[in-house]
Amino acid sequence: GGSTLGTQTIYEFFKDIVKKDFVFIDNLTQKKLNTKKNRSVNLVVSKSGNTIETVVNSNIYIRRKDANIFITENNDNYLLKLANKLKAEIVHHNNYIGGRYSVLSEVGMLPAELMGLDANKFRQLNSLIKNKHFINSLVSGVSSTLNYIKNKKYNSIILNYDEKSENLFKWYQQLVAESLGKKSKGLLPIVSNMPKDNHSVMQLYLDGFKNNFYTFFYTNELKSETLKSSQILSSQKFLRGKNLSNIMYAQKIGTENILNKKKIPFRSFE
């Protein structure tokens, strides 16, 4: 949840300049991890200190001789007791910062510092508030979403054409679901990784029930792989000279055109 998704997003965006390798264990898994134990640190994060998945993974992966850091609340919880037993480093999580916002607390900022990033640069709220374009975009986005809800469109579907943003939208999914899913109300956030999902759920999006609204997301990847033109057969010669980013953009435009023809509401960010 909030104890890892924000941090994963930070790492994904900055990993080209981060000199350390980070492995995120955010679920119960049977897979074995290949880490250099003598050169690794276990960072165990849980606000409550009693999250079952974190407790189980801690039992499987960490040992007393490891370098261990625990981030949890300062109360009578399981992970705090374990940290004391292991004589591990302990960072107390401030209990007035909720899980949805914890990326700006020690939960997100300590990992950011370990990545070699400056935590202070993540806290630029004042500059955002003073940015009229940001505020206007925020108001416009909220207004359009409320309009969709009034028209009984409760499924917010992200059509994501940017591989680097996958963790960002997993985080978005968690934030929207936990923030708005209350009192029998809310939005159902669904993330589709495109263009792969053209061959799975797109049929439902186009011709299924009509309580969805869509958001396209695309970024132009400057270092995109270029196809080997000499190996493209003549039947698909339109692909010659194209790179992956060109192709994905063309597919995005094509999908938007289809939604327009079917009068299906969407917004698009590039």
Q: Residue locations for each model-derived region?
A:
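C-terminal helical/tail subdomains of lipid-metabolizing enzymes
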Residues: 264-270
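Structural beta-sheet core signal
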Residues: 42-44, 70, 158, 214-218, ...
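Acidic catalytic cores of enzymes that act on phosphate-bearing nucleotides/polynucleotides
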Residues: 9-11, 18-20, 117-120, 131-258
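Glycine-rich phosphate-binding loops that contact phosphosugars or nucleotide phosphates
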Residues: 1-134
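A short, structural micro-pattern
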Residues: 101-104, 210, 263
